[in-house]
Amino acid sequence: MSTHHVFVYGSLKKGQPNHHELLNSNNGQAEFITCAQTKEPYPLVIATKHNIPFLLNVPGSGKQVSGEIYSVDQKMLEFLDWFEKCPDWYQRTSIQLEILKGNGESGRIEEASVYSKINFEPDWLNKPTHESYDTNGDHGLKFVCREDRKDD
């Protein structure tokens, strides 16, 4: 069985509103591997009226972003592509990550796929950037789940 490593930094992380999608075996299989951060800084911004976290594909700008690496099967990868509206909304690209903890491997560099934005509103680059995302964070911008959105 072919597996893929995927880095999640927003609503799919443990404790966040969409994490249940990774746990739902109807979507495929996902196994938590470890915590990591981007090797390079990237802008992690919260945008749109739904307060969605976006990793903007602008390496060298912003901050090193922390998140989680999951090993997913092909079915889950296809689900995540659908869920993230890839390639129209997010684009799945490769990213270099630094392992933060786990089995004495801190500091090791790993490559994984990430859902990031290549095309975005120019003013998003002026938004505050974050090292880590939490819907209940100090930013005060609570994520609006799809089922609670009035216009989607």
From Swiss-Prot:
Protein name: Gamma-glutamylaminecyclotransferase C
Family: Belongs to the gamma-glutamylcyclotransferase family.
A matching Pfam family: GGACT
PANTHER family for this protein: GAMMA-GLUTAMYLAMINECYCLOTRANSFERASE, TROPONIN C-AKIN-1 PROTEIN
GO cellular component terms listed in the entry, alphabetical order: cytosol
Keywords: Lyase
EC number: 4.3.2.8
EC supergroup of this enzyme: lyase
Superkingdom, taxonomy of origin: Eukaryota
Residues binding substrate: 9-12
Active site: 84
One example GO MF annotation: gamma-glutamylaminecyclotransferase activity
A GO biological process held by the record: modified amino acid catabolic process
